[in-house]
Amino acid sequence: FCGVNIASDSKKTRISFCGTANWTLLDKCESFLKEFFFRIKNRAFRPYLDLGFPVSGMNLREKLLKSFKQNKNLDTHIIIRKRRDSSLISKEKYKFEYWNNILLAPFTICVRGNGNFSVRFYETLALGRIPILIDTDCVLPLDNEINWHKHCIIIKNNTKPNRIVDSVILSINA
């Protein structure tokens, strides 16, 4: 992986994530209602838009992170934030923990949030780490010029979370 040292003292592969994924029942209901009304509005005013995928990726993120945490073959450093944590923790501490978490492990899980993209993907690359991109049909820049598979692990989101985790482990050990 392009000069990134993935060796560690542990026999397990270190993987990190820091971000929002822990939703309360109220958060899930709010997200469902927003998506429901968004889809109705788009069907009425923009019938040409294909919205086959969920508008929010938070449910996917939550399920995937649980699967990563439960896997005994990985040394996971996962900090799951609640939506309102940013108002409870100082901005400096919040950012420090986020950046430190990416630097802690050679691999960082990058799965979409509310949009079909991951800013964490670019931040991980900028910090010299390897992103594990869970691909939900997102478009990467310059994909006709850059072989992204040389710089990151890209796993299609077309199966169960446990199988995605297994695919990540196979890709790392290949």
Task: Annotate each PLM feature.
Residues 1-117, 135-145:
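Nucleotide-sugar donor-binding catalytic core of glycosyltransferases
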